[in-house]
Amino acid sequence: RSEFLISLNNQFKNEDVLFIGTTGNAAREMYSFMPDTNNFYMAGNMGGALSLGLGAAKAGKKVIVCGGDAEFVMHMGGLSTAGRYADKVDLTYILFDNEQNKSTGGQNTYQNHLGYINIARNSGFEVVNDVVTSVHNFKSTIKDISGLKFICVKCGVDDETPRPPLNVVKTNEFR
């Protein structure tokens, strides 16, 4: 996942785009690998990042939510709600599928049978490519993206990434 996050950092460096990281390793890795973007970390809030992103997108912000497969099913209500606003928001949900719940010990998620892409599509998201597996394809997929989009990135598991300092979690505000 880190190489994809570094790509996002380089592509959206100092741009007016809000990145929301779901709880766990997605947010940890965003903190470590995306220092030049406007990030908000949903520490301790599994399943709320997409809804927060939708609220910010409805207020006129360009939003990219970065999340993992372990929490994807917790966004079901948010997915269908976002789909109702497909023509009114600039919101991209990037699902990083590593088939693990890394932050709680690396348990397998066993969710591939759910069909993430079909769930997103049936909720009203436009799916950009079916599955992205390389940074090169990711760069072209994310370039000039707008509207309500869903991107599924199949990735591996990175080494342990340190937690952000507590003061970052407590004082993080939108810029």
What kind of feature is each model-predicted range?
Residues R28-N98:
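Thiamine diphosphate
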Residues R1-M46:
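Active-site diphosphate/adenylate-binding microenvironment
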Residues V17-F19, V63-V65, L91, I145-C155:
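Generic beta-sheet signal
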Residues T23-A26, N98-Q100, K154-D159:
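Glycine-rich beta-alpha junction loops
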Residues Q107-T141:
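Conserved thiamine diphosphate
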Residues R1-E3, F33-D36, D144-R175:
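Glycine/aspartate-rich loop-and-adjacent alpha/beta segment that forms the canonical ThDP
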Residues L18-T23, Y41-M42, V65, N129-V132, ...:
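General beta-strand structural signal in soluble alpha/beta enzymes
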